[in-house]
């Protein structure tokens, strides 16, 4: 599990266009993990990042969303809600596991693995500045 102050390990994931994106980026980076594209909470969260995108850009901060959804599902989600930032597909859950967001969850008495909604702010030096876990929307 990654912690504040640690250097972000480099990794590549495909975005909603199928292009490989390498992180960490050279700018400040905000990475948010969301459970599933086009569901109420994830849509609200993603649209909130989109509506604040100009503010992030002003501070030279690049926004990335990561979920287990396929590239195709990410593409439909981005298109439907006019999201102008990269949505990355981690179908293997490897990156989610590295970040410590692939966790045991339970609903209606059933236990399963899923993404814990979390956000990571990474500095230009590649170090994690702040982590918000168990984000509520």
Model-inferred region functions:
Residues 1-137:
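Chalcogenol-based redox active-site neighborhoods
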